[in-house]
Amino acid sequence: MTRAGILGIGSYVGEHVVTNKDFEKRIDTSDEWIRTRTGIEERRFAPDNVDTSDMAYEASVKALKAAGVSAEEIDLILVATVTPDMPFPTVSTLVQQRLGAKKAAAMDISAACAGFIYGLATGQQFIENGGYKHVLVIGVEKLSKITDMTDRNTAVLFGDGAGAAVMGAVSEDRGILAYELGADGEGAMHINQKGEYIQMNGREVFKFAVRQMGESALSVLEKAGLSKEDVDFLIPHQANIRIMEASRERLELPVEKMSTTVKKYGNTSSASIPMAMVDELKDGKIKDGDLLVLVGFGAGLVWGSLALRWGR
């Protein structure tokens, strides 16, 4: 049986570093308040002339190089984003054109902060059923363009960035072991963008995330026939350190076994998990054969988790 996994991964980080001290000068907040409630110390914003598709392209080039796969070998491009350059054409088609991935089909996925996991689960189906050999999955957001920088409740939370993964067949003892996707439309309006900017009911989102992230992580392990004792590293959506810590505690993992890139990137929505993976790989925290649990939640309300044995 064909097993789908990640062959290579890459990221793009916004060029402008915006610290908590910078926000102290703009709105009624403080570095201590932000750190205590979110764990965020700084975030990155992309320049005005860099759009979502530009960031996606840069991350994709790095992922293709890491995978040793050419753009011409990509069969499908999946872009998870809620901040496209424009309503249409899709970001995926813009990336396809820039990469020169002429034989690739292309579509965007709107699953907010869980989008990258939705993309991996979708790519897995195409690869394991024999439909496609290589799938490029991208999580990318330019949240700075839909964030009200005068709203102290949301301005300090978000950042810009992109992460891309090239998927393909891997060894039977590597790759995606199980996934879980879910949604609860009853909470749809807790995070929305009805107007120009993001609106969020932070209290309700926090309660949902603390409960659902831990439950989903445990559920995907059960689906994979594994237990929390088998987990080598947890990569949660980098939204808020308190939510992330709740997930880690549900899995009874030590602090050093969870990614915490939220402190330097903020919440980059669908890009947060692949961006974290790139950093942890560079730092040697993810090794060949490690069992990773990826888990995220987002507007919808939606959630997703994935058990992945790292390596090819």
Curated annotation (Swiss-Prot):
It catalyses: malonyl-[ACP] + acetyl-CoA + H(+) = 3-oxobutanoyl-[ACP] + CO2 + CoA. Homodimer. The keyword Repeat does not apply. One of its GO terms (molecular function) is beta-ketoacyl-acyl-carrier-protein synthase III activity. Its main location: cytoplasm. NCBIfam families: fabH, PRK09352.1. Keywords: Acyltransferase, Cytoplasm, Fatty acid biosynthesis, Fatty acid metabolism, Lipid biosynthesis, Lipid metabolism, Multifunctional enzyme, Transferase. One of its GO terms (biological process) is fatty acid biosynthetic process. It comes from the Bacteria. It is an enzyme of class 2 (transferase). The active site is at residues 113, 237, 267. It is found in: Cytoplasm. Pathway: Lipid metabolism; fatty acid biosynthesis. Its EC number is 2.3.1.180. SUPFAM superfamilies: Thiolase-like. This is Beta-ketoacyl-[acyl-carrier-protein] synthase III 1. Pfam families: ACP_syn_III (PF08545), ACP_syn_III_C (PF08541). CDD domains: KAS_III. Catalyzes the condensation reaction of fatty acid synthesis by the addition to an acyl acceptor of two carbons from malonyl-ACP. Catalyzes the first condensation reaction which initiates fatty acid synthesis and may therefore play a role in governing the total rate of fatty acid production. Possesses both acetoacetyl-ACP synthase and acetyl transacylase activities. Its substrate specificity determines the biosynthesis of branched-chain and/or straight-chain of fatty acids. Gene3D superfamilies: 3.40.47.10. Residues 238-242 are annotated as: ACP-binding. One of its GO terms (cellular component) is cytoplasm. The last Arg residue of the ACP-binding site is essential for the weak association between ACP/AcpP and FabH. The gene is fabH1. Belongs to the thiolase-like superfamily. FabH family.
